[in-house]
Amino acid sequence: METKSDYEDAVFYFVDDDEICSRDSIIDLIDEYITWRNHVIVFNKDITSCGRLYKELIKFDDVAIRYYGIDKINEIVEAMSEGDHYINLTEVHDQESLFATIGICAKITEHWGYKKISESKFQSLGNITDLMTDDNINILILFLEKKMN
């Protein structure tokens, strides 16, 4: 079992990156990013102290707000904090819903950080590999490549 000290010393491989990672690493990138969002809150880190890649992913929060609306996001975040709920990550069907889903997952784990809830609970959100289908990986890579150049 991971202790708070282990979590505080966690290594985030993509956090300082200024370029897109390989296609093979994109699932790890999204999983790590969502975990990192909890980590920066729990350990009072500077969320802006990251590379361009994470800064682009942080912008997905705004996509989530436009896509769902702030009231719906607050409702989802609160519901996810009150029990073992599950977000169906297979309901993503276009670029905007993909980015909004990544944004809302990050907002949920960030909120858990404020409530001192472990990011390991993220597994209850759903399997990140359900979200990162081949089509969604392609969408994300093409978008990030444009932003990183």
From Swiss-Prot:
Protein role: Virulence factor that affects the acute immune response to infection. Bcl-2-like protein which, through its interaction with the DEAD box RNA helicase DDX3X/DDX3, prevents TBK1/IKKepsilon-mediated IRF3 activation. Contributes to virulence by binding to the host TRAF6 and IRAK2 and preventing host NF-kappa-B activation.
Localisation per UniProt entry: Host cytoplasm
Gene Ontology CC entries for this record: host cell cytoplasm
Induction: Expressed in the early phase of the viral replicative cycle.
Gene Ontology biological process: symbiont-mediated suppression of host innate immune response; symbiont-mediated suppression of host NF-kappaB cascade
UniProt cross-references to InterPro entries, sorted A to Z: Orthopox_K7 (IPR009174), Poxvirus_Bcl-2-like (IPR022819), Poxvirus_sf (IPR043018)
Family of this protein: Belongs to the orthopoxvirus OPG044 family.
Protein name: Protein K7
The gene coding this protein: OPG044
Gene3D superfamilies xref list: dsDNA poxvirus
Alphabetically ordered keywords of this record: Host cytoplasm, Host-virus interaction, Inhibition of host innate immune response by virus, Inhibition of host NF-kappa-B by virus, Inhibition of host RLR pathway by virus, Viral immunoevasion
Complexes and interactors: Interacts with DDX3; this interaction inhibits DDX3 and suppresses DDX3-mediated IFN-beta promoter induction. Interacts with TRAF6 and IRAK2; these interactions suppress TLR-dependent NF-KappaB activation.
